[in-house]
Amino acid sequence: MISQKVIEDLETHIEQVVSHFWFEVNNQQTREDLRVSMVPYLSNLIEEGYEIEQVCDESNNSHEVIDNNELYYVVYIKKDDDLRQINTVMRKTGVSFQELRPA
């Protein structure tokens, strides 16, 4: 089972790392740099027995996402039978709540 503290610490670390990419263009290099920036932290979790997968590529950053000035980053964390998904979306400045709500 994944403890709430592990999830909260991971979310906090993601926030810190992602903040360095706020004004970067969503391209292959930026997505790779983001993934690589997370590796040291995620490696520690792997050493503790967690399975980790990062997704930040063209599969979740389509042309539409890029055209909307967004960047999607997802971390899957698994231990035993417990699997969690942490979604991070960087959006353009000035976005309204109405734009974020599903139609």
What is each model feature region?
Residues 1-103:
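Structured, hydrophobic secondary-structure cores that serve as assembly/anchoring elements
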